Amino acid sequence: MMDYKKAGVDIEAGYKSVELMKEHVKKTMRAEVLGGLGGFSGAFSLAKIKEMEEPVLLSGTDGCGTKVKLAIIMDKHDTIGIDAVAMCVNDIACAGGEPLFFLDYIACGKNYPEKIADIVKGVAEGCLQSEAALIGGETAEHPGLMPEDEYDLAGFAVGVVDEKDIITGADVKAGDVLIGMASSGVHSNGFSLVRKIFEMTKESLDTYYDELGKTLGEALLAPTRIYVKALRSVKEAGVRIKACSHITGGGFYENVPRMLPEGKQAVIRKDSYEVPSIFKLMAKKGQVEEKMMYNTYNMGLGMVLAVDPADVDKTMEAIKAAGETPYVVGEIKDGEKGVTLC
């Protein structure tokens, strides 16, 4: 007799996954969360938002791209969730917002409860780092659509900001200083090229590189930095962030101009910080041109912000106090909207 399990969907495995992930999800709860895990929808009170003059909700949705494939190959699934959260909450923070809550979506060929719980463990860790509550999610088993061992991960975040505090870049002026925050490595973009490079050169993910201080796989799988606390620290120091860019897919050439008004150009000095060894290794092994690297990857800077020259010292101190590494990387000039790397 045919049943759902024989068709490829194991309901009992789904129940077990939920039980295993509960301990991780509970750690992310905030006072504003109403109800518990397992409801038809997640509920989050907005009562505290009344403290803002004109509260604006911000939303972000993203995934981890083909970095997920790397986690599958390495059979290490407890950090990829951090990437999913980071990709969403960093975008919200770029607009001056504070993340409120997060939801995840996992599509898999077969539900292996321990693996799903590991993925959610990473999601919960990302939520803890950004102080967002994990109020819901979905794990969808897709037999026949995906191989049993494969999965994809995406997320959705909601945050809030007072309208007067939204970072728009509108008042950026010539002379403003650009400050970059160090990345942990490749973060979550450009992994199709990463995999092609190392497939072509037949490099093993288990290969240890002295310049990396770890194996290739460990360096590539390093989770995306979450900059929410650092940007909050800057704001609490009394600094007005004029513009902010999350350096993701498209690298510097696509993302930096997004924070600029017309008639303003960002000039970034490549020698103002040390490019991480993983990027140098990728460029060398894959014979990738420098411009392509900067047009694809963060090259060591996961976030770039513009501040008034008088606020540079306070900004640097606030970022350091939040546990991130800042660099003064350039300045704003008059000129055609865009970015110049020199």
Language model feature labels by segment:
Residues 17, 21, 43, 88-89, ...:
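Buried hydrophobic packing segments
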Residues 23, 29-184:
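Glycine-rich phosphate/pyrophosphate-binding loop regions near the starts of catalytic domains
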Residues 2-7, 115-130, 146-151, 204-205, ...:
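Glycine-/charge-enriched secondary-structure boundary and capping motifs
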Residues 18, 117-120, 191:
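Hydrophobic face of alpha-helices
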Residues 174-218:
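Acidic, glycine-rich loop-and-beta core segments that form the ion-binding/anion-interacting portion
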Residues 1-32:
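N-terminal amphipathic/basic leader segments beginning at the initiator methionine
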Residues 10, 62, 175, 246, ...:
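Residue-level signature of catalytic and energy-coupling elements of molecular machines
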Residues 18, 50, 65, 141, ...:
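Residue-level detector of flexible, active-site-proximal loop/helix-junction positions
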